[in-house]
Swiss-Prot record:
<dbReference type="GO" id="GO:0043065">
    <property type="term" value="P:positive regulation of apoptotic process"/>
</dbReference>
<keyword id="KW-0812">Transmembrane</keyword>
<feature type="transmembrane region" description="Helical">
    <location>
        <begin position="36"/>
        <end position="56"/>
    </location>
</feature>
<dbReference type="GO" id="GO:0015031">
    <property type="term" value="P:protein transport"/>
</dbReference>
<feature type="transmembrane region" description="Helical">
    <location>
        <begin position="115"/>
        <end position="135"/>
    </location>
</feature>
<dbReference type="GO" id="GO:0005856">
    <property type="term" value="C:cytoskeleton"/>
</dbReference>
<comment type="function">
    <text>Regulates intracellular concentrations of taurine and glutamate. Negatively modulates SLC1A1/EAAC1 glutamate transport activity by decreasing its affinity for glutamate in a PKC activity-dependent manner. Plays a role in the retention of SLC1A1/EAAC1 in the endoplasmic reticulum.</text>
</comment>
<keyword id="KW-0007">Acetylation</keyword>
<dbReference type="GO" id="GO:0099523">
    <property type="term" value="C:presynaptic cytosol"/>
</dbReference>
<dbReference type="GO" id="GO:0032874">
    <property type="term" value="P:positive regulation of stress-activated MAPK cascade"/>
</dbReference>
<keyword id="KW-1003">Cell membrane</keyword>
<dbReference type="GO" id="GO:0007611">
    <property type="term" value="P:learning or memory"/>
</dbReference>
<keyword id="KW-0963">Cytoplasm</keyword>
<feature type="modified residue" description="N-acetylmethionine">
    <location>
        <position position="1"/>
    </location>
</feature>
<feature type="topological domain" description="Cytoplasmic">
    <location>
        <begin position="78"/>
        <end position="93"/>
    </location>
</feature>
<comment type="similarity">
    <text>Belongs to the PRA1 family.</text>
</comment>
<dbReference type="GO" id="GO:0006749">
    <property type="term" value="P:glutathione metabolic process"/>
</dbReference>
Amino acid sequence: MDVNIAPLRAWDDFFPGSDRFARPDFRDISKWNNRVVSNLLYYQTNYLVVAAMMISVVGFLSPFNMILGGIVVVLVFTGFVWAAHNKDILRRMKKQYPTAFVMVVMLASYFLISLFGGVMVFVFGITFPLLLMFIHASLRLRNLKNKLENKMEEIGLKRTPMGIVLDALEQQEETITKFSDYISKMKE
């Protein structure tokens, strides 16, 4: 299936009034995770634009350290995903504690970059946009269009770059399983 770039959402939808933001329920991790995944899929192009702007500014100020940081993060992420698909312990950790998995990737990247220097470039250039994405995705309430777009992604009617990344992190498998179970129950 072809990979489609999600459309750029209107900025007044991306940053609406405060009535469309709410603190997540920290006691219900699965609901919070669902909100984050849904918003990451729906606003992925907006997140990419914001991250590209921030990374460009930091990269302009310190290009070598920014490139080094990007290479290290990509290599560490790829290594952890490969290891998680080949080792049961990492696979379980990635599935049960996705936030911890991402934090381990970030900490490992931080450690490797600190060996080469340029730690602050890494923190502000790469990690800060990721942190902003996570905060926005956690706080932004979903709307009906968001839910519809996510269902299309979940059942495989469309593929997006963020969907591929979330699949690598095994964040969409559970939803697809739940959806197929729901359909089979409806048939009975």
